[in-house]
Amino acid sequence: MSYNYFGKKILILGLGLTGISCINFFLKKGIQPRVIDESNKPIFLNKIPKNIEYKLGNLKENWILESDLIIISPGISSFKPILMKARSLGIDIISDIELFSRETKCPIISITGTNGKSTVATMVKKIAEKSGYKVLLGGNIGFPVLEMLNKKASLYVLELSSFQLETTFNLKSKIAVVLNITEDHLDRYPEGFEQYKKTKLSIYNKAKICLIKLKKGEKKPFNTKSKKYISFGTCNNNDYYINYEKEKAILFHKNKKIVDTSNILLNGHHNYENILTSLAISDQMKFDQKVSINVLKKFLGLPHRFQTVHINNNISWINDSKSTNVDSTKAALKNLKIKGTIWLLLGGDGKSSNFNILKKYFEKIKIKIYCFGKDGLNLSKLCKKKSIYTKTLKQAIILISKKIQPGDVVLLSPGCSSKDQFSNFEERGNLFIKLSKEIN
């Protein structure tokens, strides 16, 4: 289908990297959009061409309601009342991913999930490159997708958040996968978890091959002319699954052993699931499985994902700043099997999530919990006997440094967004790394 944007009133919401890429996209087509950013001082304001009309501060209602097409940045909720009103009037509200999907015919692998998206997307990119593809990685990681249209590629790998999928309707992926869905971003969705889940699952709508995760006893849908289903997961009712033999994880494909994880550099069940999914994707792309396995054996993981950043006096400092939801913190705690004390740094913006699931882990293990940030005080009430509240991450680390002993682990796995006190999770993780080395 061909889309004609000429003669339409086009409005771009948001002046981050996504918004700037949207401006450039339309300017190359000879179209001048309008732009609104809710901030009075957006960081990319100096990148707006002089002839572009823009407004800063609150969303300008008359600009929104007189538009024919609105492109919304992922940081702006599509459930704002003014945008819901615009939608009810028949105004199209779409993402940059939707614009991108209308323009390209190159094969796309799309990956979403609450946790593990970046890791799996990066694994698949590395495997595809070793298999001879010219690969571009974008979406929620790497390039803004519209910038990728200007570069040569034989395959796109997209990491997609629920925010991006909210307003994406025509993404025709060769392969689409939802890694997992657990509570996150509930402050964004008026109807709660089910709405968040539905948004994630929409990635399958126009995909050719759907990789789905089955729980015990579940069955995958029947293949149709337009869709093929491949399953993965922990249970052996999946096409790809994990089995433990003497506490060692073995990866299987249809009852055939394909990977012994004792030969893999990454540890932890969540990482074994990421590896399994990457193999399933690679097999569906018909990459040489030996090449895929060799890449995965050498993969060291991504920064800020359960990364040991400092060891001194037999005290380990683990940076898991990318842990921005409850489930990722739970996975980090399950990974740690030590005789010493775990000093957990937990806190930030909890995004209305339910943290009660962590209680049983706190009660079973030798742990001290230092809660900080916007929701730190409430988090400290989860397990009062083992918790201390501080305003900032730095204050918590200073207190911990006076008490840690050889054999202990200091774990930054906040389970929360960093936006209350930091620009992003990277800034939070980098502060942790800096302080771990200074204090020791």
From Swiss-Prot:
InterPro entries given in the database record: Mur-like_cat_sf, Mur_ligase_C, Mur_ligase_C_dom_sf, Mur_ligase_cen, MurD
NCBIfam families, A to Z: murD
Catalytic activity as recorded in UniProt: UDP-N-acetyl-alpha-D-muramoyl-L-alanine + D-glutamate + ATP = UDP-N-acetyl-alpha-D-muramoyl-L-alanyl-D-glutamate + ADP + phosphate + H(+)
Originating species: Buchnera aphidicola subsp. Schizaphis graminum (strain Sg)
Main location, first listed in the record: cytoplasm
Keywords, in A-Z order: ATP-binding, Cell cycle, Cell division, Cell shape, Cell wall biogenesis/degradation, Cytoplasm, Ligase, Nucleotide-binding, Peptidoglycan synthesis
HAMAP family, per the entry: MurD
Residue sites binding ATP per the record: 113-119
Subcellular location: Cytoplasm
GO CC annotations on file: cytoplasm
Protein name (database record): UDP-N-acetylmuramoylalanine--D-glutamate ligase
